[in-house]
C-alpha cells in the first residue's frame, strides 16, 4: 500500500490536502476495492486496533460504511449513540472522547451537528500526547472529507478503473446542484474538485446559494480563476456538464422558509432525464444520500444505471474509508 509519503495523523478537512495525498487515497482505495471483490473480503491490516465510531448525529450510510470498513481491516469497533450515552446525564463531548481513549481506542471517527467538534477532539488528543487519530465523519455545515473523497474516487474509477488519479478530472465540468448553503458535502467536494483542475458549477436558488458563498469557502484567498462558477438557474450549470452532483434539501438545518414549495423546487432545480439533455451524452449523476425522490432527482433517473452512480458511491465508500483508516492507522501497529 502506498503510505510512504502519507504523514497526516488526522483527517479533518480537505482544504489543505495536497495532490499527492489525494492520489495516495485513490490508489489505496483502488487496492481495497479489489479486496472487496474477493470471496474473503478481509485483510489483517489493523488487527488489534480499536476504531470508535462516535456519532453524535443520526447516520445510516456513513456510520455503517465506517463500521464495515474497520471490520474489513480486522479492527475492533466500538459504536457510540448519543441517545443512550452518559451525555444524557451531562457528560461533555471531550470527557466522552477521553472515556473511549481510556478504553484503548486508536482511531476516533466523529460526526457532530456542530462544526469544529472533530477538530476540538483532535486538538485535545494532541495536547494529551496520545497517538489517537481523529477522522471527521461530518461536522455541521463545515465538511465531510470521506464523502468528498469517495465521490472523487467514484468518478475517477469510472474514467480509469485500473488507475484512478486526480488528473483525470482536469478540465471536466462538474455541476453541483441543490442545498449548497447547508451542505458540508458541497464544501468538501469543492476542495477536491478544485484541486483536480475541474470546472465546478454551483446551482441553487439564491436563498440556498448566497453570492458571497465563494468568499465564505475560500476566506481571504480567492478561488482559482475559471474554476468556480455560481448560478441561480439550473440550465447554465448543466450545459455540457460531464457529471452532476445533486444535494439533499436539508430542511432540518433551515431556520426560515427558504423555498416556496418542494414541487416548485423540483420543477426548477430537480434533475430529470429531460434536463440531462443539456449535458454531455454520457453524463453521470451522483447524490450523497439520503435522497428525497421526486425532489432533488426524479425517481426513475435515480434507479437508472445508465446515468446514476448513486449505488456506486455507496460501494466506493467502504473502499475509501478502508483507505483512510489504513493510512492514518498503519503507523500505530
From Swiss-Prot:
Residues holding L-aspartate: 89, 184, 248
PROSITE patterns: CARBAMOYLTRANSFERASE
Keyword Cytoplasm: no
Source organism, top-level taxon: Bacteria
Transmembrane segments: none
Entry annotated with the keyword Transferase: yes
Binding sites annotated in the UniProt record for carbamoyl phosphate: 61-62, 111, 144, 147, 289-290
A GO cellular component annotation in the UniProt record: cytosol
Protein's pathway: Pyrimidine metabolism; UMP biosynthesis via de novo pathway; (S)-dihydroorotate from bicarbonate: step 2/3
GO molecular function terms attached to this record: amino acid binding; aspartate carbamoyltransferase activity
Role, per record: Catalyzes the condensation of carbamoyl phosphate and aspartate to form carbamoyl aspartate and inorganic phosphate, the committed step in the de novo pyrimidine nucleotide biosynthesis pathway.
Family: Belongs to the aspartate/ornithine carbamoyltransferase superfamily. ATCase family.
Name of the protein in its database record: Aspartate carbamoyltransferase catalytic subunit
Organism: Nostoc sp. (strain PCC 7120 / SAG 25.82 / UTEX 2576)
Gene responsible for this protein: pyrB
Amino acid at each position: 500500500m502506498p503510505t510512504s509519503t502519507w504523514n497526516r495523523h488526522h483527517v479533518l478537512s480537505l482544504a489543505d490536502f495536497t495532490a499527492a495525498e489525494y492520489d495516495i487515497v485513490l490508489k489505496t482505495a483502488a487496492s481495497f476495492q479489489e479486496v472487496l471483490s474477493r470471496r474473503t473480503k478481509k485483510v489483517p491490516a489493523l488487527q488489534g486496533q480499536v476504531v470508535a465510531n462516535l456519532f453524535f448525529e443520526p447516520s445510516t450510510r456513513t456510520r455503517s460504511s465506517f463500521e464495515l470498513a474497520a471490520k474489513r481491516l480486522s479492527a475492533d469497533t466500538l459504536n457510540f449513540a448519543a441517545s443512550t450515552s452518559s451525555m444524557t446525564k451531562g457528560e461533555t463531548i471531550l470527557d466522552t472522547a477521553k472515556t473511549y481513549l481510556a478504553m484503548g481506542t486508536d482511531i476516533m471517527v466523529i460526526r457532530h451537528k456542530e462544526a469544529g467538534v472533530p477538530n476540538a477532539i483532535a486538538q485535545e488528543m494532541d495536547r494529551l500526547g496520545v497517538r489517537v487519530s481523529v477522522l471527521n465523519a461530518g461536522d455541521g455545515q463545515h465538511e465531510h472529507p470521506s464523502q468528498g473523497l469517495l465521490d472523487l474516487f467514484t468518478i475517477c474509477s469510472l474514467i480509469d478503473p485500473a488507475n484512478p488519479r486526480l488528473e483525470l478530472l482536469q478540465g471536466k465540468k462538474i455541476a453541483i446542484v441543490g442545498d449548497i448553503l447547508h451542505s458540508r458535502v458541497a464544501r468538501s467536494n469543492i476542495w477536491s474538485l478544485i484541486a483536480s483542475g475541474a470546472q465546478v458549477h454551483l446551482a441553487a436558488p439564491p436563498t440556498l446559494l448566497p453570492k458571497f458563498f465563494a468568499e465564505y469557502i475560500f476566506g481571504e484567498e480567492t478561488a482559482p480563476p475559471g474554476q468556480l462558477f455560481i448560478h441561480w438557474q439550473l440550465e447554465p450549470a448543466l450545459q455540457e456538464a460531464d457529471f452532476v452532483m445533486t444535494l439533499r434539501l436539508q430542511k432540518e438545518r433551515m431556520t426560515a422558509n427558504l423555498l416556496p414549495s418542494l414541487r416548485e423546487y423540483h420543477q426548477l432545480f430537480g434533475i430529470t432525464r429531460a434536463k440531462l439533455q443539456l449535458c454531455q451524452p454520457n453524463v453521470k449523476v451522483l447524490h450523497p444520500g439520503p435522497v428525497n425522490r421526486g425532489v432533488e432527482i426524479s425517481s426513475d433517473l435515480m434507479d437508472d444505471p445508465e446515468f446514476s452512480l448513486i449505488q456506486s458511491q455507496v460501494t466506493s465508500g467502504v473502499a475509501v474509508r478502508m483507505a483512510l483508516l489504513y493510512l492514518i492507522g498503519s503507523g500505530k501497529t
